[in-house]
């Protein structure tokens, strides 16, 4: 998918925003905040996928509208929830040093990088709306398996330091990129 065709913000494409996050991530690694290559690669995956849910037609209409348009909770799903459908488990599993929960950890960081809703509840209760929102990109998304739910529950319900670090570094990169810091 060409992410230069989709807007993350009125003045920035999704790809430009991802590139900004990756620049911040590289700075964090250079400064010694991220001490392992596998953790760096997992955060990189989270940075890449975190806003891809913004490719939906409704989000693109809103972000490019001349007059402010508000999120329609009856017709739309928050982008952090939609973004998880783009996370490629095979890409995560290719990371040297990964373990079996790393896919769930990356998904956890992506899904919870905003507090717009309860992502799991939204996925379980709004399946039809999710399908509608993702209809035009259905060939780009992945189905969430039962294994995903089991592993996510384990990551979410215990204090999984690796998941917390991935989410924390994603936040640091996203907030500093969005605010043009660093």
Where would I find each of the regions flagged by the language model?
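Metal-dependent phosphohydrolase cores
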Residues: 1-182
């Amino acid at each position: 998918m060409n992410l230069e065709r989709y807007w993350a913000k009125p003045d920035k494409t999704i790809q430009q925003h991802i590139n900004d996050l990756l620049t911040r991530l590289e700075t964090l690694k250079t400064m010694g905040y991220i001490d392992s290559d596998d953790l760096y690669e997992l955060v990189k995956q989270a940075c890449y996928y975190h806003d891809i849910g913004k490719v939906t037609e409704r989000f693109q209409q809103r972000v490019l509208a001349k007059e402010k348009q508000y999120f329609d909770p009856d017709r739309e799903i928050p982008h952090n929830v939609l973004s998880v459908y783009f996370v490629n488990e095979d890409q995560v599993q290719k990371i040297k040093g990964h373990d079996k929960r790393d896919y769930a950890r990356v998904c956890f960081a992506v899904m919870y990088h905003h507090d717009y809703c309860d992502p799991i509840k939204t996925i379980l209760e709004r399946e039809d709306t999710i399908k509608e929102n993702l209809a035009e990109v259905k060939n780009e998304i992945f189905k969430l398996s039962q294994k995903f739910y089991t592993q996510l529950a384990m990551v979410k319900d215990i204090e999984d330091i690796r998941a917390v670090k991935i989410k924390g570094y994603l936040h640091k990169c996203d907030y500093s990129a969005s605010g043009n810091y660093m």
